[in-house]
Amino acid sequence: GVAPDTFLGASVQTAKYIVEKGLIGRPVTCRASVSRNYGVYGEFLPHLYKKGAGIGFDMGGYYLTALASILGPLKSVSAYTTISGKQRVNTRVGAPMFEQHYELEVPNVLVAAMQYDSGVLGTLHMNSDSILDERTSLEIYGTDGILLMGDPNQFGAPVYLQKTNAQPIAFPFTHGFEQNSRGLGAAEMAWSIRAGRNHRASKEMAFHVFETMHGILQSAENGKLHMMESTFTLPAALPEGYIGDGGWTRIEESALI
């Protein structure tokens, strides 16, 4: 399986359940947002501001994969990016590059518009030049309700459902793997090979997400709409109800069989 595999966790699988059961009606739009401070992280993780990295490639996979696993492939993307505070000085005492000047090589702020094959329209906002406290948002707006998801970098972030004239309610998890379950994609792949079926964390979906981020950066550079060339088959949801560690409850891993 290909990372990230957090979409197989309790949070995103429950969100997928809500959408596929029609609890928000027909999905119309979606919105993903994350803000961090790589000015702090970058002082001891310098790869974050090098070419091939940045917040887009560091965190974008979690958000785009979560949406892809629910909404399917994209048709096109367009974007704007910027490098906020390009010239920096390392202020972390004890760091190998302490007091050295350095330059950000990649955008640390990006805003993208996305069109899915299904017709759903979405936006992606990523900013790594904000306060240290991380802010995340992942939402799908439907004709009959709104799905509010937690941090897709976690397996068990809370999921909320909002209906007309009502406050958002915490939706109970329908699936297992609520705790940190890194490696879940590889485990699901192993069970899939044993069963002779396609695994869910596929290279096709991962490549599509990879192309999406490249397309976003390319669109920002050339000012043109990026038409997606890759596609993938929407992965089936894991069977619901396998929540627990065995004993008097179902064991989570049985959902992978």
Which residues fall in each region the model found?
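Glycine- and charged-residue-rich phosphate/anionic-cofactor binding loop of Rossmann-like
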Residues: 3, 168-174, 192-209
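Ligand-binding pocket scaffold of soluble enzyme catalytic domains
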Residues: 12, 181-184
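C-terminal hydrophobic helical "lid"/dimerization subdomain
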Residues: 206-218
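Predominantly a Rossmann-like dinucleotide-binding segment in NAD(P)-dependent oxidoreductases
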Residues: 1, 6-103, 223
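Contiguous beta-strand/loop segments that form the cofactor/metal-binding neighborhood of enzyme cores
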Residues: 26, 65-155, 183-199, 213-216, ...
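Short, hydrophobic secondary-structure boundary micro-motifs
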Residues: 2-3, 27, 42, 171, ...
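Structured beta->alpha junctions
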Residues: 4-7, 34, 128-130, 205, ...
